[in-house]
């Protein structure tokens, strides 16, 4: 049965539903303990689009409230009661309710529950929409065609019936989900995430203020840095060309003469590009290529070189007769950069994560490991960094400013990673406030409203303390509890023991700053499941040196080594990663059944005989592919079993701190007074009136410390707080 609550007496007359008053609707719902909830709106932005309807329902009764004629505040007491409200993607609905000063207490978000059930599965493998889930559990097909027309049609008879239909299956879906939730012991995880979504909706609703003049000045500086970086690259290529390829008096080169003359038609004008080489010394031919064959080999190689530099021999009256060589590479095109870097001796071969095949790449990670190959590497990395800043942190941020609030309201994804970590980006704002550069120029652009202070608080060495706690490593625990707490110096001492020797940890930062800096990368790599190969690739050092560093690390931190071995064993035994023992979030090895099927064949010696034969004669056969896929996925899952547990604990303490903070603000009527501006994994940024910033700072630190306790049990984890006129950290 569908009921409509509307003050538009002459509109929406239909035999598909009955019209009732607000009072009658509240009377009908008075006995409901569990209420299915949904909204329909004019659009996605709570500040510029209207709330059209709010729907309440059970399996048998649905009530649609016409919010264009009925004040939704008449349902405030009902919505803020202790009833449980079931919804789907309640992050969206809560913001529209918050806009009307309505803050529900008890909610169950079916979409969050579904994501927790399938955490670890690749995006798209299991649909998370209400339509997909209703079909998966109930076998019903929800018609969503009306939803796409609401923005154009507004409230109509079809929209009212559609809105009622959206709340009808929610309780049946919840009942079906609970069987799986109980089987996976996810009850606490579901409850936890349902608490956090209320805070996350408030974060999105608050948004953050951007200092527009300062941002525009930053954009100009960023563009200037990019232009300088591009000029440095162009100058280097031309200089290299002159030194190695264009100097007829060079005595260090083989006397091989190769001439090219290219003609390029631009409109009615013909430009001639002449390249004259005496030789190209960096090219090393295979040892078997000598004499005349070397000349031929060199010519073939030089065909790759000449597009990088052009000379305008013809000129014109307007641009003059500048015959100086000019670099013609588009540095933003990897296709144009790769041939040059290959010619200079860089190894650009990597593996495509999607296709699992070899490919060539000039990504920063690859070039950074080969800084000693050529000076152009550092110049190109500078260019890449400057280019990313210009393209990612420019006009798009100004475009994201809401015309009503003057603030940026970013979109967040509560379970944006398999670790249950929060992620940001996309949506109406399409900017990522969690991935902003750390430089003071950028951070200073984020400011509070006039009369407010900005408050930043971040955990003290969060990851290192979590690792010490979960691994129960005595060296790390002793450092944090009884020592100076400088874990980077401790890692340097363990990894580079042959250099640092018996130097006290307190003195390493001053005496061995380079090794302490190197230790940060080693600590990050190993703590997240990396090995000697990871260190070798990240630092561009020989494997033997990387192995020595890795072995020293593991000897120095036996607790970490033991803990990682345990993680690796458990994941391939259970088929999932227990992310933490408190909430019992888990990330599945999505293809575990297939991997287990393959692994069971390994005990058969005949299988390996067949595998070796097929690998030699038919490497594309199913058996060879199965073995390769097994060990690739096993390696990835084992690394994740180490990495995910650490990241999840960090995410959980951040979420718990945020829940505690939100509840405090709500209890003390400070919602809207204290704004939650930016969450960044281990950092919380607020703004509040100056008169209360000292008090709120203390409350924030207390919430963060309390949030950390259940997930970092063997040592305290505090937070540093700063108060200022803009984002400080």
Language model features by range: what are they?
Residues 35-38, 107-108, 210, 454-458:
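Short hydrophobic beta-strand that contains or immediately precedes a catalytic carboxylate
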Residues 117-119, 171, 202-226, 467, ...:
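Catalytic palm subdomain of template-directed nucleic-acid polymerases
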Residues 2-17, 45-182, 190-200, 488-496, ...:
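Active-site-proximal helix-loop-helix substrate-binding element of RNase H-like nuclease domains
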Residues 171, 217-255, 259, 553-569, ...:
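Polymerase palm active-site segment centered on the conserved acidic dipeptide of motif C
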Residues 1-39:
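N-terminal accessory regions of nucleic-acid-interacting proteins
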Residues 140, 162-175, 183-210, 259, ...:
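Core structural elements
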Residues 12-14, 39-41, 49-50, 55-59, ...:
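Acidic, glycine-rich two-metal-ion catalytic cores of nucleic acid-processing enzymes
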Residues 104-107, 143, 148-317, 328, ...:
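Mixed-charge, glycine-rich, non-catalytic linkers/tails in nucleic-acid processing enzymes
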């Amino acid at each position: 049965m569908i009921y409509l609550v509307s003050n538009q007496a002459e509109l929406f007359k239909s035999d598909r539903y009955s019209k009732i008053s607000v009072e009658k609707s509240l009377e009908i719902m008075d006995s409901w303990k569990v209420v299915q909830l949904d909204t329909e709106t004019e659009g996605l932005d709570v500040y510029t689009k209207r709330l059209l309807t709010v729907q309440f329902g059970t399996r048998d009764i649905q009530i649609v409230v016409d919010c264009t004629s009925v004040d939704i505040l008449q349902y405030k007491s009902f919505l803020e009661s202790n009833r449980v409200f079931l919804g789907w993607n309640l992050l969206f609905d809560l913001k529209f309710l918050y806009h009307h000063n309505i803050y529900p207490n008890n909610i169950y978000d079916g979409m969050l529950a579904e994501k927790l059930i399938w955490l670890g599965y690749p995006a798209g493998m299991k649909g998370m929409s209400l339509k997909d889930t209703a079909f998966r559990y109930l076998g019903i097909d929800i018609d969503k065609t009306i939803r796409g027309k609401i923005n154009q049609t507004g409230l109509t008879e079809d929209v009212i019936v559609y809105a009622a239909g959206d709340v009808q299956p929610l309780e049946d879906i919840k009942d079906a989900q609970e069987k799986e939730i109980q089987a996976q012991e996810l009850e606490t995880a579901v409850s936890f995430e349902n608490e956090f979504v209320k805070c996350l909706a408030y974060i999105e609703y608050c948004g953050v203020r951007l200092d527009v003049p300062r941002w525009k000045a930053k954009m100009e500086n960023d563009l200037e840095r990019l232009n300088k970086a591009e000029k440095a690259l162009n100058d280097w290529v031309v200089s290299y060309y002159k030194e190695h390829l264009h100097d007829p008096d060079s005595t260090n080169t083989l006397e091989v003469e190769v001439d090219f003359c290219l003609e390029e038609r631009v409109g009615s004008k013909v430009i001639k590009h002449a390249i004259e080489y005496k030789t190209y010394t960096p090219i090393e031919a295979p040892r078997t290529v000598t004499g005349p064959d070397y000349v031929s080999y060199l010519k073939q190689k030089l065909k790759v070189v000449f597009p990088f530099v052009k000379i305008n021999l013809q000129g014109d009256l307007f641009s003059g007769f500048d015959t100086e060589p000019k670099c013609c590479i588009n540095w933003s095109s990897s296709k144009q950069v790769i041939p040059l870097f290959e010619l200079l001796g860089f190894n650009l071969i990597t593996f495509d994560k999607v296709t699992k095949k070899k490919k060539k790449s000039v990504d920063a990670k690859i070039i950074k490991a080969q800084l000693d190959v050529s000076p152009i590497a550092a110049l190109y990395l500078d260019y890449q960094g400057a280019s990313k800043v210009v393209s990612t942190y420019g006009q798009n941020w100004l475009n994201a400013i809401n015309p009503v609030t003057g603030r940026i309201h970013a979109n967040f994804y509560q379970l944006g990673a398999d670790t249950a970590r929060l992620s940001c980006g996309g949506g109406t704002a399409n900017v990522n406030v969690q991935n902003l550069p750390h430089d003071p120029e950028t951070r200073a652009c984020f400011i509070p409203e006039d009369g407010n202070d900005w408050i930043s608080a971040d955990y003290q060495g969060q990851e290192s303390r979590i690792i010490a706690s979960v691994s129960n490593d005595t060296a790390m625990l002793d450092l944090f509890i009884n020592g100076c707490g400088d874990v980077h110096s401790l890692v340097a001492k363990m990894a580079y023991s042959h250099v640092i020797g018996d130097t006290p940890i307190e003195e390493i930062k001053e005496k061995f700053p380079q090794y302490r800096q190197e230790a940060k990368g080693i600590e990050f790599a190993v703590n997240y499941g990396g090995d000697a190969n990871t260190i070798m690739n990240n630092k561009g050092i020989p494997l033997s040196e990387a192995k020595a560093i890795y072995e020293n690390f593991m000897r120095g931190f036996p607790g970490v080594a033991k803990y990682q071995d345990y993680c690796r064993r458990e994941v391939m035994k259970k088929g999932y990663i227990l992310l933490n023992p408190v909430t019992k979030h888990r990330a599945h090895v999505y293809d575990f059944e297939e991997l287990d099927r393959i692994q069971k064949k390994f005990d058969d010696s005949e299988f390996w005989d067949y595998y070796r034969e097929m690998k030699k004669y038919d490497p594309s056969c199913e058996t060879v592919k199965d073995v390769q896929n097994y060990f690739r996925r096993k390696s990835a899952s084992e690394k994740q079993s180490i990495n995910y547990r650490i990241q999840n604990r960090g995410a959980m303490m951040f979420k718990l701190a945020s829940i505690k903070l939100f509840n405090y603000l709500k209890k003390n009527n400070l919602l809207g007074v204290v704004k939650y501006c930016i969450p960044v994994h281990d950092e919380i940024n607020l703004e509040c009136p100056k008169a209360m910033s000292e008090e709120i700072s203390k409350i924030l630190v207390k919430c963060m410390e309390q949030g950390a306790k259940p997930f970092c049990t063997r040592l305290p984890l505090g937070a540093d707080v700063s108060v200022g006129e803009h984002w400080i950290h």
